[in-house]
A protein has these predicted regions:
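Beta-edge loop/turn motif
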Residues: 87, 93-102
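Hydrophobic alpha-helical segments and helix pairs
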Residues: 16, 28, 32, 48-51
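Short, basic/hydrophobic alpha-helical segments
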Residues: 77-92
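Sequence/fold signature of self-assembling virion shell proteins
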Residues: 4-8, 42-78, 103, 107-220
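Sec-exported extracytoplasmic/periplasmic mature domains
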Residues: 18-26
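Short, glycine/acidic-rich hinge or "gate" loops at secondary-structure transitions
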Residues: 26-44
Length: 220
């Protein structure tokens, strides 16, 4: 991401502001809780949107997993099966989101197969995709750095944890954007342009939380 090999836009003030905003938006996607009404423009501000944790909590779909320290794939498959049996969720529409550490913990429980022949210059080790597969479809497990323990939260994110796993319906949960990120010039200070960034968006769950689950705090 360079401009004429001269400047990396990520190192400009505007670039850093965009990075901070995207991190904020990703954090809000999981743990946003406007019911706190913190009034501080945080993910717990009254103008924040409800994240997956809030949606699942309001639907009564939080499941305590603090006592599970092994057999993660088997447990996830059991939870997925229960969700399919008891709701309108289907295997081919389900997706799990987890922390990168939990993703590694899943892989550590499996028996790796390493193949090396005379033409191999490198040895590759690590997962390149994990899915729970059935004859009715498969549900991918996707790691993200945005599921973690966050300090300073008092709502549903107060117990955010690296062991959290979110299960949701990909067709029901959608990120709706009313206006993409844009900038408005505010003037100049010396040689610097001052701009304001804005974006209008929200998270929508058309299942009203019935297909959204938070599996809380696996012991990893």
């Amino acid at each position: 991401m360079t401009t004429l090999e001269y400047m990396d836009p990520r190192e400009t003030t505007l670039g850093q502001g965009a990075i901070a905003h995207n991190k904020f938006k990703a954090k809000q996607f999981y743990y946003g809780d406007p019911s706190v009404a913190a009034g501080d423009q945080s993910i717990e501000d009254g103008d924040a949107y409800e994240g997956l944790a809030k949606i699942s909590n309001d639907a009564g779909n939080d499941v305590d997993k603090s006592g599970v320290s092994s057999g993660f794939l088997e447990d996830l498959l059991d939870e997925l099966t229960d969700a399919v049996v008891n709701t309108g969720l289907t295997f081919d529409r389900a997706r799990f989101m987890c922390s990168q550490q939990f993703y590694n913990a899943i892989y550590d429980e499996q028996t790796p197969v390493i193949r090396i022949d005379g033409y191999d210059a490198d040895v590759e080790y690590g997962p390149q995709g994990i899915r729970l597969s059935t004859e009715f479809g498969s549900a991918p497990i996707t790691p993200t750095p945005n599921i973690q323990a966050y300090g300073g939260l008092s709502g549903v994110g107060s117990d955010a944890d690296l062991g959290d796993v979110f299960l949701f319906d990909e067709l029901a949960v959608q990120f709706r954007q009313l206006a993409p990120m844009s900038t408005v010039p505010l003037g100049r200070t010396g040689l610097a342009d001052r701009v304001s960034m804005f974006e209008y968006y929200t998270l929508v769950d058309r299942s009203q939380g019935n297909h959204t689950f938070r599996l809380k705090g696996y012991d990893i």
